[in-house]
Design a protein with these regions (language model features):
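Negatively charged
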Residues: 1-301
Length: 301
């Protein structure tokens, strides 16, 4: 079988399809938009020539019966939006070449059976919104190069199996809202250098096991805070140590950033005052003088 350049939706929603012929000549194909979307009975996939592919939007989305994936050539791919989204049967993922990829929105979202992830070259990626959202089986995450990434909205949301997180370079990030929402297994968090981010709303919401948050996280924060910048950022983080809360407030104070001119100005967080230090009072006073509203244990300071 020989195809032209466009294989868009060619096998879309063929629920009865259980295999794909390895003899398909796909060497000229550039567009794989939703090619095998909703092929829910597809149990395996052959090593096709996908070297010319640039668009892999939704290509294998909802192929829920796939348990593994071949090491295909995707070095020309730029857009991987939703490519393997909802491939809930995948237990592993190969070290494919995605070095040209810029858009990884929802790429592996809800791949719930993945327990680990390879060290892919994601250095060209700019958008990672919800890329690994609801990958609840992940127990570790690699030190990927995401230094060009700007959007991390909901990126690791619902990755409840992660207990730690790598010190990624997120220096270009502008949005990290809900990035680690309900990562209920996280016990500690690293420095990431997210100094260009304008919004952290819901970023660590519901991280119920999070105890340790680093000092100096916001010290070099230079972005202008967006509306509702810290809205519910640490709500539900009931295990945070007093030191971690002090680290957060002291660091925001050190940054010199003032509250946004619009939207919610609250920084709401639970604080174990019995093991705290006087430093928090100074931080609270400084932040209030810059327009922030500080709410500790449900009480406005």
């Amino acid at each position: 079988w020989s195809f032209g350049t466009n294989l868009s939706q060619a096998f879309y929603a063929l629920f009865s399809l259980s295999s794909v012929s390895a003899n398909m000549d796909t060497s000229a194909v550039t567009n794989y938009f939703s090619t095998w979307l909703y092929c829910t009975n597809l149990a395996s996939f052959p090593l096709l020539d996908t070297s010319g592919g640039t668009s892999f939007i939704g290509t294998w989305q909802n192929c829920t019966s796939l348990t593994s994936f071949p090491l295909i050539t995707t070095s020309s791919g730029t857009d991987f939006t939703g490519a393997w989204q909802n491939c809930t049967g995948l237990t592993s993922f190969p070290l494919i070449d995605v070095s040209s990829g810029t858009n990884f929105t929802t790429t592996w979202r809800n791949c719930t059976s993945l327990t680990g992830f390879p060290l892919l070259d994601t250095s060209s990626g700019t958008t990672f919104a919800s890329a690994w959202r609801d990958c609840s089986g992940l127990t570790s995450f690699p030190l990927l190069d995401v230094s060009s990434g700007t959007s991390f909205a909901g990126t690791w949301q619902g990755c409840s199996g992660l207990t730690s997180f790598p010190a990624l370079n997120m220096s270009s990030a502008t949005a990290v809202n809900a990035a680690w929402f309900s990562c209920t297994g996280l016990t500690s968090f690293p420095l990431l250098g997210a100094n260009s981010a304008t919004t952290f709303s819901f970023a660590w919401y519901g991280c119920t096991s999070l105890v340790s948050f680093p000092a100096s996280f916001f010290d070099n924060w230079t972005a202008t805070p967006g509306a509702s910048c810290f809205y519910f950022a640490w709500s539900g983080c009931t295990s945070l140590s007093a030191t971690s809360v002090e680290n957060i407030l002291n660091s925001i104070a050190t940054s010199g950033r003032s509250a946004p001119s619009s939207g919610n100005k609250e920084i709401t967080i639970d604080y174990n005052a019995s093991s705290g230090t006087p430093s928090i009072s100074s931080a609270v006073s400084t932040l209030k003088s810059r327009g922030w509203i500080i709410v500790l244990n449900g009480v406005t300071q």
